Amino acid sequence: MNQYKRLLSNTFIFAVGTFSSKILVILMLRFYTGVLTQDEMGVADLIIKTTSILYPVVSLSIGQAVIRYGLERRRRKPDVFTIGLLTVACGFLISLPFNPLLKLVHYNTSAGAAGSLLDYRILIYVYVLTSCTQNVCGQFIRAIGYVRLYAIDGIFRTFMTIVLNILYLKVFRWNIYGYVASIICSDALSTVCLFMIARLWKYFRLRRINFYLWRSMLLYALPLVPDAILVYIIGFSDQAFLASMQNTSVSAIYSIAYRVPTLIALVASIFIDAWQLSMVNSNTKE
C-alpha cells in the first residue's frame, strides 16, 4: 500500500510542476504573437526544435542514467553526479567541430529572404550546454530525494522564462535572440539554485573517477538516444519542411497549433516519471 501511496504522491507532485508550467507557456502565446512576427516565431521555434534533437546526442541521454544509478543505495552519489556532468562536458566538446552541419537546416521567410541555423550556432550551442547541465542536476536531485524541489524547479524555470521574455522581447526588443536567451538564462538560474539549495557541489569530485560505473551508465543511456531523437524528429521534420519549402511564417502557425496536442502526451510522461522513481526505490529497498 505504501508503494501505491508513494506513486500517487509522486504523480501529483510532478503533475503540479509540469502542468502549471505548461499552462503558463500556453497563456503566453498571445504575448509571443504580439511581439514577434510570424517569421521570427518560425525561426525561433526551429532553433528550439533543433536544440531538442541535439540535446540527447550531446548528453548521450546521461540524465536517465543519473536517476537510474543515483537511486541505487549501493552507488556512491558523488560518482554518479560527477560522471553525469563529465559526460555532458565531453559530449559538448566533441560536438563543437560539427557546427557547420547546422547549415543543413535552412529556411525561407515570407519576404523571400533565405537563411540557415548556422547563423545562430553560438546561441544553439549555449542553449544545448545549459539545457544538458540543468537536466543532469534536475535528475540527480530526484535521485537523492528532492522530489518537491524538482517540481518547484519546473515552475521556477517557467516563471523566470516568462519574466525574461517580457524583459528581452518587450523592453530590449531582442526578438529571436531574446526568445531563446530567456530559456538559456532560466536554465542557468535553475542550475545555480539547485546547486545552492541541494548543495550539489558536495557531490562533484574529480578525484578517483569510477570508470567502471561510467561504462555501465553509458551502456544504459546510449540505447535511449535514438528513441529520444526520433520523438523530437516527428515534430521537427514537418516544421523544417514547411520552413524550407514554404516559409517560416507558415511553420510558425503550424508550431503554435502543434503545442496544444502535446499536452496530452504530458499526462503519460508525468506518470512514467513517477512510476520510474517509485519502482526503483521499491527494488532498492528489497
Where are these regions (language model features)?
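Interhelical loop/hinge segments that connect adjacent transmembrane helices in multipass membrane
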Residues: 1-7, 116, 176-180, 192-235, ...
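Signature of the first transmembrane helix
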Residues: 6-63, 92, 96-99, 127, ...
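Alpha-helical transmembrane segments of multi-pass membrane transporters/permeases
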Residues: 8-20, 74, 78-82, 126, ...
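Alpha-helical transmembrane segments of multi-pass membrane transport and lipid-handling proteins
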Residues: 19, 82-112, 268
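Alpha-helical transmembrane segments of multi-pass membrane proteins
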Residues: 53, 57, 93, 97, ...
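Helix-loop junctions and terminal segments of transmembrane helices
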Residues: 58-74, 143, 261-286
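C-terminal transmembrane helix end/exit motif
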Residues: 63-66, 139-143, 147, 167-172, ...
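Hydrophobic alpha-helical transmembrane segments
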Residues: 118, 122, 152-200, 220
